[in-house]
Design a protein with these regions (language model features):
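Terminal helix/beta-alpha structural elements that buttress the NAD(P)+-binding lobe
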Residues: 1-206
């Protein structure tokens, strides 16, 4: 049994599945906080690393809803999905800075790092100001360069959950579910997660 205060809960809209609802709390609120941390507005160009992962796949959609031009860093297998959601897909690897410059027209306004491993440095190299860079994973780089780490700031905000659930319910936001595992297969789920090649969220069910 789990006991939760009533004001920490929201109703599940009819068009939101239990799997989507389960994935929404952490990934959805983290993506929401990261997108709003970099102060996106219509016409801005934002780069998002890990753009097809659990958090990134939601962040790219929220950025598009705000009217931003979104460049998503992802493996080639996820480029079609990103393009279907209006995102300019860019491959990882050597030459990524030049590919981003080509896709952006030479200038970016903001960078959301949902992957880690040097992307804060890349964001600075591309000219994003520290106060418009947010990382949800590379806290050492954030401390070194003074960039934001606001990925969890919306977690306890039920109004954010209500807003996200409404976007799903009205078809404006998709929560990609990579795979659903039963709790007995939790080891397999974590091994899948560790490979970092999933599109969207991995969900555990009883």
């Amino acid at each position: 049994m789990v006991v939760v205060e009533a004001d920490h809960l929201i109703g599940r809209p009819p068009h939101v599945s239990w799997e989507q609802a389960g994935a929404l709390f952490v990934a959805g609120t983290t993506a929401y906080a990261a997108v709003h941390a970099v102060s996106l507005k219509a016409g801005d160009t934002v780069v998002i690393s890990g753009a097809a992962d659990g958090v990134g796949s939601i962040a790219v959609q929220l950025a598009k809803i705000l009217g931003a031009k979104v460049i998503g860093l992802a493996s080639a297998a996820n480029h079609t999905w990103l393009a279907e959601h209006g995102v300019i897909a860019v491959a990882y690897g050597e030459g990524v800075a030049d590919r981003i410059r080509a896709a952006s027209g030479g200038k970016i306004d903001a960078f959301i790092d949902a992957f880690g491993g040097g992307y804060v440095d890349l964001a600075l190299e591309l000219g994003a100001a520290p106060d418009r860079i947010d990382t949800i994973i590379d806290f050492a780089a954030a401390a070194k360069h003074g960039v934001k780490t606001e990925g969890n700031s919306a977690a306890a905000n039920t109004q954010v959950l209500v807003e996200l659930a409404s976007l799903i319910d009205t078809g404006r936001l998709e929560i990609p579910i990579a795979k659903v595992y039963h709790l007995a297969d939790v080891r397999d789920a974590y091994q899948d997660l560790a490979r970092r090649h999933t599109r969207g969220k991995i969900v555990l069910v009883p």
